[in-house]
């Protein structure tokens, strides 16, 4: 009966001491995993931020460009007076101060580039 008690006590002491070591080891493993998890989260966060910035840039670019399907706004033809500050000359024309023949009008006109 004594040997059974001693054996049981010995097994109990070994189990407790090894279990304690496993507990410390598990704690260290968990700490390492949480640190790795944080680095993965930071990486994923940065990746998501980059994707969002790319999408935002594309959306802003699309807003600034005119659609190919949209009609051109009404424009001023060649030789027609235009406003220097708000030129509405048709494409291929530029709002310029007249040379020679239109000097006395003191106005700007649409001319070919």
From Swiss-Prot:
Q: Where is this region: Disordered?
A: 61-83
**Entry's family note:** Belongs to the neurotoxin 14 (magi-1) family. 01 (HNTX-16) subfamily.
The disulfides recorded in the entry are 75-90, 82-95, 89-110
Know the name of this protein?
U11-theraphotoxin-Hhn1a
Main location class: secreted
Q: Which residues form the propeptide?
A: 22-74
Cross-referenced InterPro entries? Toxin_22 (IPR012627)
Please tell me in which tissues this protein is expressed. Answer: Expressed by the venom gland.
Q: Write out the entry's keywords from A to Z.
A: Disulfide bond, Ion channel impairing toxin, Knottin, Secreted, Signal, Toxin
Top-level taxonomy: Eukaryota, Metazoa, Ecdysozoa, Arthropoda, Chelicerata
**Signal peptide coordinates:** 1-21
- Which GO molecular function terms does the record list? sodium channel inhibitor activity; toxin activity
Highest rank taxon of the organism: Eukaryota
What the record says about its domains? The presence of a 'disulfide through disulfide knot' structurally defines this protein as a knottin.
Q: Where found in the cell? A: Secreted
Tell me the function of this protein. Answer: Probable ion channel inhibitor.
Give the CC-aspect GO terms.
Answer: extracellular region
């Amino acid at each position: 009966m004594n040997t059974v008690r001693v054996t049981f006590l010995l097994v109990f002491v070994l189990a407790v001491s090894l279990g304690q070591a496993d507990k410390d080891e598990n704690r260290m493993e968990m700490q390492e995993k949480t640190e790795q998890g944080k680095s993965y989260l930071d990486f994923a966060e940065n990746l998501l931020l980059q994707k969002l910035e790319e999408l935002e840039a594309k959306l802003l670019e699309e807003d600034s460009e005119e659609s190919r399907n949209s009609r051109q706004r009404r424009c001023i033809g060649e030789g027609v007076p235009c406003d220097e500050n708000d030129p509405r000359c048709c494409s291929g024309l530029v709002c310029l101060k007249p040379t020679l023949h239109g000097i006395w009008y003191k106005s700007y006109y649409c001319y070919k580039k």
